[in-house]
Amino acid sequence: MREPGFWYRPPSLLSSLLRPLGAIYGAVAAHRMAQPGTAVGVPVLCIGNFHGGGAGKTPTALALARLLLELGERPVVLSRGYGGRLHGPVSVDPGRHGAADVGDEPLMMARDIPVVVARDRVAGAALARSRGASVILMDDGFQNPAVAKDAALIVIDGDRGLGNGYVIPAGPLRAPLPPQLARTDALIVVGRGRAADPVAAAVKDNGGLLLRARFLPAEASLAALCDRPVLAFAGIGDPARFFATLRTAGINVAAERVFADHHPYAKQDLAGLTEIAGRDGFTLVTTEKDLARLRSDPAHAAFARSVVPFAVTLEFDDAKALRDFVIEKLTQARDKHRRAGRS
């Protein structure tokens, strides 16, 4: 599903007409967020968004996983597995599972870190613990109360911010902002844009940590695309950001094709892309997430080999502040668990 364009424009007649529905949706979401979660025995760090759509949760999860490994932890990612058919809990095996089974994001992350997919988050956390997790990284699920969270790190795009600030379906917010701010421990602003400044100020006023980060392209991707006109395509939450990242890196984006988030590519989609690339001499480039979907389908394997993945990592402006924050939250969580165990 593609997000409506009016979400990220000034309030309009349509968004105003939808605000009563947003008020109902928001009231339900806020009530749900207030419910107590189940403690799962190990620290839980949740990476989420205030809004629907993409903002960089997956690169953030991978960056946090690398930090946790440096700290001697054994992180396991817990994901709902959006777009996959398996309800779980199941440990993701890239050699056995495809995107249609577990979703594209878990499949991509499972190349680097253990990932558990589960619609039932508590059951998924139990499986993660059985796999030796010393820390659970919850990928999304900020608004889901099932599992008690020891820290919530919210990711936001600095260029887009929160759009019109309304709740779904009138705007992009998954719940009213005040109850979300109250549960936010850190805000990660990705990119140099200033659209997120108001919410960043609100998080700081609430005592939360503000972190800024940016995407860094992998050298291999830059080398493969240097001096070539490319046809860039993506089926992610914010394809415009992907295209902008390519251009910022100096890539000659000659053409773009946008698909819905988590789009299951069909034969005709790939035939159309191949025809344009062949006719105009373009190199095909897409996101790692899209390529994970393509590679996992045997029918699309040949096409996937013709596509260059544009790999990125997330670099924090103040890596020490993030490290200190994580260490503090892990220490607090373990102290709390010990006290609960003695009571």
From Swiss-Prot:
| Matching InterPro entries | LpxK, P-loop_NTPase
**Keyword Phosphoprotein carried by entry:** no
Q: In which pathway does it act?
A: Glycolipid biosynthesis; lipid IV(A) biosynthesis; lipid IV(A) from (3R)-3-hydroxytetradecanoyl-[acyl-carrier-protein] and UDP-N-acetyl-alpha-D-glucosamine: step 6/6
Tell me the residue numbers annotated for binding ATP. H51, G52, G53, G54, A55, G56, K57, T58
Q: EC number(s) per UniProt?
A: 2.7.1.130
Q: Which reaction does it catalyse?
A: a lipid A disaccharide + ATP = a lipid IVA + ADP + H(+)
**EC class (word):** transferase
Report the GO terms under cellular component: plasma membrane
Purpose: Transfers the gamma-phosphate of ATP to the 4'-position of a tetraacyldisaccharide 1-phosphate intermediate (termed DS-1-P) to form tetraacyldisaccharide 1,4'-bis-phosphate (lipid IVA).
Q: What is this protein called?
A: Tetraacyldisaccharide 4'-kinase
Q: Which organism is it from?
A: Rhodopseudomonas palustris (strain BisB18)
Q: What is the lineage of its organism?
A: Bacteria, Pseudomonadati, Pseudomonadota, Alphaproteobacteria, Hyphomicrobiales
